[in-house]
């Protein structure tokens, strides 16, 4: 199994009145898993793509058990973990490295949380989350509680804004061995899950954001942090 991105020429060039219409995302922006990859940690390098790249607006394809256990997907997982930690970030979805498949990696390391004050940790309900992989995740909201916090994205670097998310969620998925997993999460971990699974459905955090709060990181620190 090999991985690649594949877009029609007219979409990449912007030719044609409907070349990049989001409503046609499935047919206009096909992504296959049949040819050579743009790179893996064993060879080339998967780079984090930025907002405006059509791959971020696709509905990602599910993976079957054989695909999950293939060398290509295992290499993709390793490369995604590397990119996430280099950024650094607490989660990364496959579309963010240009591969439209239903796969995310998540890790909220203790050293990230140590940068926050005790009050911030408690308010955000943020605890360390060990590295794990979720494939073909299905998320459901539990209860009616929500929380609103500033949120950023590795594909929209340098910006944050307020996003309302469910406080408690349940996720059913497969792990990197194609074994079923069930997660019930609350607080910041629930937010990470919602953010990353949104990516698999062609959604970015700005689609759920209060755009009046959309800020550069500099202005977030200047006007919003702790306010």
From Swiss-Prot:
Metal-binding recorded as keyword: yes
The protein's required cofactors: Fe(2+)
Domain of life the protein comes from: Bacteria
Main enzyme class: hydrolase
GO biological process, one term: co-translational protein modification
Comment on bound cofactor: Binds 1 Fe(2+) ion.
Catalytic site: 196
Binding positions (Fe cation): 153, 195, 199
EC numbers on record: 3.5.1.88
A GO term, aspect molecular function: metal ion binding
Family that this chain belongs to: Belongs to the polypeptide deformylase family.
Name used for this protein in its record: Peptide deformylase 1
Primary gene name: def1
């Amino acid at each position: 199994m090999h991985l690649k991105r594949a877009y029609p020429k007219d979409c990449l060039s912007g030719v044609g009145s409907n070349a990049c219409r989001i409503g046609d995302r499935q047919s206009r922006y096909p992504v296959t898993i049949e040819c050579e990859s743009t790179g893996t940690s064993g060879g080339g390098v998967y780079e984090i793509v930025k907002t405006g790249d059509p791959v971020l607006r696709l509905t990602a394809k599910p993976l079957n058990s054989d695909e999950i256990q293939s060398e290509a997907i295992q290499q993709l997982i390793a490369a995604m973990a590397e990119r996430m930690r280099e950024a650094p970030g607490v989660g990364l979805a496959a579309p963010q490295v240009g591969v439209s498949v239903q796969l995310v990696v998540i890790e909220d390391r203790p050293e990230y949380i140590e940068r926050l004050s005790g009050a911030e940790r408690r308010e955000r309900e943020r605890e360390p989350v060990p590295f794990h992989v979720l494939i073909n995740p299905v998320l459901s909201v539990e209860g009616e509680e929500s929380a609103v916090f500033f949120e950023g994205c590795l594909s929209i670097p340098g910006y944050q804004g307020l996003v309302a998310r469910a406080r408690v969620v349940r996720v059913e998925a497969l792990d990197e061995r194609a074994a079923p997993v069930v997660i019930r999460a609350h607080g910041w971990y629930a937010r990470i899950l919602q953010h990353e699974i949104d990516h698999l459905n062609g959604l970015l955090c700005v689609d759920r954001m209060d755009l009046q709060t959309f800020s550069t990181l500099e202005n977030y620190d200047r006007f919003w942090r702790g306010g």
